[in-house]
């Protein structure tokens, strides 16, 4: 498999695990025609990396990804970091702030990275960034999350719609 420019570079990290996708989530839902269909990978250094390809329907200004899309992908990527080693715990967003540094194009694969910076019993703080195809930081984010089980979040959870979908072209490094 040939790696895209977003996946190449000295900062490549070994993938330890692929995280599940849902059916209908806007960010990771594989059956959501308008969604990002992002794939999430846990790395050897305790980060979560999302690979996703935004499309014209995700634009704001012509040729540019809408800032809300950046917020969505970073929120989910950072929030998933708590599931490393704790797949039954979910991060529910309390506070999220972003800094936009460069525009993001659509139609190419992009990479978001998230990590926990402070981990308490009921809360955690995280930070993350999205990279341009040439490896520059385009968006940075910081957030705070409450730790919850899925039963505390919703009574409409369907475990059959939340599973890992392995593909032959899944990367071994991101």
Give the residues covered by each predicted segment:
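N-proximal, solvent-exposed amphipathic alpha-helical segments enriched in charged/polar residues
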Residues: 14-26
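Short beta-strand micro-motifs enriched in acidic
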Residues: 41-43, 115-119
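Hydrophobic beta-strand-centered segment that forms part of the acyl-chain substrate-binding groove
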Residues: 3, 77-111
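A generic structural signal for short beta-strands and their flanking turns/coil linkers
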Residues: 21-22, 34-36, 46-48, 90-96, ...
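Catalytic strand-loop segment that frames the active site of acyl-thioester-processing enzymes
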Residues: 23, 27-65
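HotDog/MaoC-like acyl-thioester-processing domains
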Residues: 3-17, 105-106, 117-174
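A structural signal for short, well-ordered beta-strand segments
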Residues: 50, 96-100, 114, 128, ...
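Conserved N-terminal beta-strand and adjoining loop/helix that marks the start
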Residues: 68-72
């Amino acid at each position: 498999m040939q790696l895209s420019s977003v996946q190449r570079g000295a900062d490549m990290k070994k993938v330890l695990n692929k995280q599940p996708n849902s059916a209908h989530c806007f960010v990771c839902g594989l059956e959501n025609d308008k969604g990002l269909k992002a794939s999430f990978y846990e790395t050897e250094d305790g980060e979560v990396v999302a690979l996703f390809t935004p499309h014209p329907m995700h634009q704001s200004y012509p040729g540019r990804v809408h800032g809300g899309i950046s917020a969505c992908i970073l929120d989910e990527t950072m929030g998933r970091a708590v599931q490393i080693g704790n797949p039954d715990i979910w991060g529910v967003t309390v506070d999220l702030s972003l800094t936009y540094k460069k525009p993001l194009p659509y139609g190419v694969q992009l990479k978001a990275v998230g990590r926990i910076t402070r981990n308490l019993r009921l809360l955690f703080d995280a930070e993350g960034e999205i990279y341009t195809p040439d490896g520059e930081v385009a968006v940075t984010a910081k957030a705070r999350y409450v730790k919850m089980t899925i039963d505390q979040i919703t009574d409409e959870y369907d475990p059959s719609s939340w599973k890992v979908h392995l593909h032959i072209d899944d990367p071994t490094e991101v």
